[in-house]
């Protein structure tokens, strides 16, 4: 009798455990050769966690529960997507000097993330090849893309059979290549199809009927958003209109907002796409006089208070970079690793250029350009600004490149500085007079008309 009682209690205990599945999520990792002092994790547009790397290159956190979804892990200036589900226990290793190429996941839930990383790298390797195929006919191009799509599908089938993914993970991992190749086809049509008739458009775009235009689960997934941006761009083009010319016009971006309003169903997706279009329009500084008109329409479409605040702030920051205004003050770090105000720098007309410690090839080409400009414009001071804080490695780079450390600085808070100075591209250059007033807040160092 007692044995039966104990057996019953044990079975009840087991059943009780089964009714309470593990929902905890562990996320940790190590950053080799860090390019900044922290790692941030985002869910949607919200910061979930920030890990400081001051005393260690490792970080970790156990969460009692997290909603399944696509999270973003950022180590400035790079980021990657991570697919997390209940009971995942993931460790990620990163070498910041080769961020995407070095990404390796291990632990429970690693396989789906390694698959996403592998797909991304394979697609990047295919970019040059596919660009070379833009001269082929629509039929030939579709055949090429279909062949690559079939190859990725076979890889996915093998990965799924070995790991028994959840339906949610299956959807995300399949979307990584399905929407990527759909986006490539949209771009081909965008660049080559401006003379197609309606029948040619319909034949080429047959893949669209298999796709979803309101998938909120993918609202923060790059392949999906990239596809939709190409889709709405193509839909916004007028018959015979050239994309490379049209994209410079505010009216074109207004038409893209109309496509979002009429064709995109998911609220989160709509808001993300409208935000992306708003960024492209506002950062097209040649359209500055038309931005108020654009924003009026954007305000009607957007339903996200945080995005509204963000876009308005960007517009205001851009206004503060108008010619004749004083350059907004930020805190910089000099080559002695001491902090100072940017207001202390203006002794003579100055050209500010930017570089990243993780993109040394870009830095080398930048320095070649700067040395040429220095020889031609001795009345200007040319100041380099690393978008990451300076460190001993950066100081060694200055010596190797034979740069005057007195003209080299680093940002100590990229988030604040990039907003105040509207730093969105490494080729961005700011030209200042000796009073610290802006002459050109949005010059491009590599453009042919830079010296004008």
Predicted regions and their residues:
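Short, internal strand/loop/helix patches
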Residues: 397-434
């Amino acid at each position: 009798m007692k044995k039966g009682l104990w057996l019953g209690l044990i079975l009840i205990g087991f059943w009780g455990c089964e009714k309470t599945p593990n929902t905890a999520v562990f996320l940790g990792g190590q950053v080799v050769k860090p390019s900044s002092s922290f790692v941030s994790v985002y869910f949607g547009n919200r910061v979930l966690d920030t890990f400081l790397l001051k005393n260690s290159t490792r970080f970790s956190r156990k969460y009692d529960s997290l909603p399944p979804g696509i999270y973003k892990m950022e180590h400035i200036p790079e980021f990657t997507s991570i697919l997390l589900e209940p009971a995942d226990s993931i460790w990620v290793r990163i070498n910041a000097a080769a961020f995407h190429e070095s990404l390796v996941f291990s632990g429970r839930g690693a396989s789906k993330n390694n698959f996403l990383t592998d797909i991304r790298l394979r697609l990047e390797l295919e970019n040059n090849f596919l660009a070379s195929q833009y001269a082929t006919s629509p039929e030939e191009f579709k055949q090429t893309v279909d062949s690559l799509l079939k190859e990725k599908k076979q890889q996915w089938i093998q990965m799924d059979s070995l790991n028994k993914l959840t339906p949610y993970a299956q959807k995300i991992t399949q979307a990584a290549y399905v929407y990527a190749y759909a986006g490539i086809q949209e771009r081909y049509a965008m660049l080559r199809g401006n003379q197609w008739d309606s029948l040619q458009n319909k034949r080429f775009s047959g893949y669209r009927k298999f796709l979803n235009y309101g998938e909120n689960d993918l609202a923060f997934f790059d392949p999906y958003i990239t596809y939709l941006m190409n889709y709405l761009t193509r839909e916004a083009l007028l018959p015979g209109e050239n994309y490379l010319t049209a994209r410079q016009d505010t009216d074109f971006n207004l038409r893209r907002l109309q496509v979002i309003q009429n064709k995109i169903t998911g609220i989160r997706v709509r808001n993300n796409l409208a935000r992306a279009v708003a960024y492209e329009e506002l950062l097209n500084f040649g359209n500055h006089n038309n931005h108020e008109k654009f924003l009026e329409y954007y305000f009607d479409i957007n339903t996200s208070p945080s995005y509204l605040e963000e876009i308005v702030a960007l517009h205001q920051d851009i206004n503060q970079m108008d010619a004749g205004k004083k350059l907004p003050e930020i805190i910089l770090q000099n080559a002695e690793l001491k902090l100072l105000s940017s207001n202390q720098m203006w002794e003579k007309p100055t050209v500010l250029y930017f570089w990243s410690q993780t993109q040394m090839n870009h830095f080398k080409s930048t320095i070649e350009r700067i040395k040429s400009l220095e020889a031609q414009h001795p009345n200007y001071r040319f100041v380099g600004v690393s978008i990451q804080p300076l460190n001993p490695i950066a100081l060694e780079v200055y010596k190797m490149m034979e740069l005057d450390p007195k003209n080299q600085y680093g940002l100590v808070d990229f988030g604040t500085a990039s907003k105040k100075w509207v730093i969105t591209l490494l080729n961005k250059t700011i030209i200042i007079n000796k009073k610290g007033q802006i002459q050109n807040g949005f010059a491009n160092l590599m453009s042919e008309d830079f010296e004008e």
